[in-house]
Amino acid sequence: MMSIAAFLEGMHAQAFPSFGSERTGAPVVSYCRIDDKEIRMREPILDPDAVIIQDPTLFHSVDVFQGLHQDGFVLINSARPFEELGISEFLETLPESHVCAVGATELAIQHVGRPVPNAALLGGFAAVTGQLKFESVDAAIRKKFAGKIGEGNAAAALAAFEAAKAA
């Protein structure tokens, strides 16, 4: 949906997943490049401008911040304080306004009725980075999901956007 939102703003985008292990429950890494000019490279992103951590239990098993720029953005799916997550020391190295935690799973349950945090995280990403307009995020969600599912996901994204802006 992030790449769809970027396309809707007239940008070029590329999104693709990377699966490490073939077993259920293994961490999945997804990449999205956004640029105002054509994107020709197709390899994984080794030095991201931003990371979105959907599952904070990965902090102690995977280096989710590897390669992140010194002025990069971090969005975490959690309602818990950074100290409780055990990552506050690393996050202190980044600009304070570039770091945010949003309880995206809880927002998804509230608005969609299921623990599907992707749309909420996209709303939070738009707020934290300013890379995408919320209107594009909303349109991408509604393009991907019809009816009540689209409405619920758009509402979760708006709630996350507003929570991230207020943080």
Language-model regions, residue ranges each:
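Active-site cofactor/cluster-binding pocket
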Residues: M1-A167
